[in-house]
Amino acid sequence: AKIAIGYRMDEIKNEITGKTKACFEPALDYVVVKFPKWPFDKFVYATRKLGTQMKATGEVMAIGRNFEQALMKAVRGAEISHDCLADVHMRALDDEALTAKILAQDDERIFAVYEALFRGFSIEKIHQLTLIDEWFLAKLLHLCDLEKRLETEPLTHDFLRELKRNGFPDKTIARLSGNSAFPHLPYSYKMVDTCGAEFAAETPYFYSTTDEEDEASAFIAEHSSKKPVVIVFGSGPIRIGQGIEFDYASVHCVWALKDAGYEVVIVNNNPETVSTDFNTADRLYFEPLTPEDVGDIIRVENPVGAVVAFGGQTAIRLTKWLSENNIPILGTPADSIDAAEDRGRFEALLKQLHIKQPVGDTVHTAEEAIETANRLGYPVLLRPSYVLGGQNMIIAFSDADVKEYMDIILSHMEGNLVLIDKYMMGTELEVDAICDGEDVLLPGIMEHIDRAGIHSGDSIAVYPAWNLSPAKTAKLVDYSTRLALALNTKGLINIQYVICQDQVYVIEVNPRSSRTVPYLSKVTGIPMVDIATRVMLGEKLKDMPYGTGLAPISSYTAIKVPVFSFEKLSGLDTQLGPEMKSTGEVLGIAPTMREALYKGLVGAGYQLTDKGGIFITVRDTDKDEIPDIAQRFADLGFHLYATAGTAAVLRDHGMSVTLVHKISESEHNTIALLESGKVNYIISTSKKGRTPARDSVKVRRKSVELGIPCLTSLDTAVALADILKSGFTPDTAELVDICTLQK
C-alpha cells in the first residue's frame, strides 16, 4: 500500500526487525509449510481429484527448523485425524491399489506416496509417477526411515531428540514404538525475524523447535511488563462449519483483554487470519492446537488463565486437557461444557428445568442405531457428539439410510457417541446470550426462514424474529436465562430451538461463541465479545450500560444469507440438510424484511429475474405444499415445468404445467430442458440424494454448471416468490447506514 502511494522500498521500515528496510533481502533460518484444509471429510461423495480449480476451504501454516519438522506440524495441525504421515487405510492397500492411489492426484496423495516409500518404492519410480521433485521425496523417505527405526530401536535420549527434531510428537512416538515410558523433551521457541538472527527482532512471533536456546523465555524476561498473562487459543484452519467468525471473536477478545490490562498471547496456526498477524496480540505462537503443542507454551508463559470460548471446536477440544492439568479456564468451566454435550447429563438438566427436547438416545453401533430409529419412528436425525458445522449429521428415512450414514460417521469420529433424535419439522430459532452467573443479556432472537432440518449455518436467518408471539418470546427468554444460569455460564452461550405444534423444544446448547456472534453484534450494536470477555474476567452485566434480559428490538430487519461454493466441488449434492455446506454469508439490511431479503439474495450471488420458467421436482412429502408455491410463481407469469409426479399434483390443482421426462426416460429430459435456457429457477427436493448417481443429484449438479438458482428448501422458494412480487431492483432498493439506524 505504501509503494502504491509513492514510497520507495528503502523508505519503508521492516516492522519485524525494526532496524532494516523493506529492500533488505530476507535471510531465513526456518522452513515454512502451508497445508490445505479440504472439505472431503464432510462431503464423502464429492470428487476428491485436485486440479486447477481450488477445492480447499482453508489452510494451516507450520514453521520448523527443517522441512520434516514443519511438515509433521502441518499434518497434525490440519485436524484431519493424522498425527503423522502414516495412514492406516493406505497401509491396508496392496501395491497395485496403492500405485493407483498415487496416480489419482487427490488430497490423500501425500499419504499414498509416504506409504509407497515406506514399502520400498524407489524415489526414482515415484518421481516418474508423480513428477514430485526428488528433494521432497528424499525428505519423506527420511521420515519413513525414522518410523521404521521406531519399531526396532530403543528410545535412547539421542534417538528421542532426533525424532522430536524431525517433528514426531510424543503421541506418535508412543504409538509407533509401543512404548510410552519415555520423558517428554520440552520444546524451546525461536523467533521469526526474517534476518537469520543478524538483528534482534522486535516482533514476538515464535515457533517451537528442539534447540537448547529458548528465545521466547529470553524475550519475556527482557520485555516483562509485569502484567498478568492470558492465552487465547484460536480456531485453526478455516473449514465449513468453523470459519472466520471465530477469528473475529478471538481478535475482539484479544482487544478486550488488552484494554483490561492483560498481556495477551495467541496460539493459532492459520495464516489467513487477523489473529495471526504479528501485531495483534502481545505474543504469537504459530503452533498446532494440540495438548502437547500448547503444553510447553503454557510452561513458558505461565498464564493466569486460558480462553477457549472463541476458538470453535478446535479450542473446545483442549478444555478437558487444560482442566486435568489445572490450567485455569477463563469463562464457562470445563464441566459445564461437558454437561451441554453429554447426552445423559443434558437430558437430566432439561428434566430438572422442565424444558422439552426432541426424544432421542445415544448409540455406539449401526445395529443399535437401527433399533433406536425404529423405536423413535422415521425420520430421525443422526449426529456425532462434539462436532461443529453439522459434520456427518443427517436425516435418515429408512434402515438403509441409518446403516449407510453410521458407516460414514463411525469411520470419521474419534471415539464419541452418536446421537439419534426424532426429527421434528417446525420453525427454528437461535439465541446468542451473555451470562455472568447472575444475570443474562440476550442481544436478540434470530428466526430461520428455513424450517428445522436445514443446518443453522445454511439457513437464511432473520433478526428480529418476525413470527414470534409475545408469549413465545417470553418463553424463549425464560428458557435461555435458566439454561445459561444452570450451566454456570460465564460468557457467551448459543441456544437453538424449534417450535413444533406450538411447543418449544431445545435442539442444542453451546456454552461458547457461535458463528452468529459477528452478525448479531453488528446488527444490534452490542459488542458481544467485549462484554463476554469482561464477564469472563469477573465484571457484572448490571455494571455495564447494556442492561439484562432481552435487548430492545431494532426498527429495521437484518437478514443473513448463506453463500455456497458448489461449483468448486464436482459430485457434491447441493440439497441442503442438517450437515452444513455453506462457505460464507452476506448481510442484507433494510426497513422491511422483503427488501432486506432481496439485498441478501443479490449479495449472495443470486441472479434474480421476475419472468421465465421454473422447473419443479419434489419428494412425496413435499407435494402437499408445492401447489401453493407453484401458484405463486404462476401468478408472476412464470411457465411451470415438472416431472410426472409433481406435474400430476399441480394439474390436479388446476395449473398449466409442461411435463418433463426423467433423465433415464427420454433424450428430451430434464437435462435437455435446463440446457435449453428456458428455465430460470429450479425447485428440487428428494428423499435421499447423497450419492451422485441419482437423477435428482444430477439435476442439481447441472444447475450449478449452468448457473441456475436451485432451491432445495420450500421455505426459501416461498420467500423468493414474495420478493419477486415486491419488484425490488438495484435502483429502487434503499441504501442503509446501519450506524444511523442503530441511533
What are these regions (language model features)?
Residues 1-149, 153-159, 163-167, 222-228, ...:
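ATP-dependent carboxylate activation and anion-phosphoryl transfer catalytic cores
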Residues 341-344, 387-391:
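Conserved A3 ("GATE") glycine/threonine-rich loop of ANL adenylate-forming enzymes
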Residues 371-380:
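Acidic/histidine-enriched active-site and ligand-binding environments that engage anionic O-linkages
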Residues 74, 191-355, 364-371, 589-740:
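ATP-binding N-terminal substructure of ATP-dependent carboxylate-amine bond-forming enzymes
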Residues 117-131, 149-198, 202, 614-624, ...:
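Cofactor-pocket helix-loop regions in the catalytic cores of large enzyme subunits
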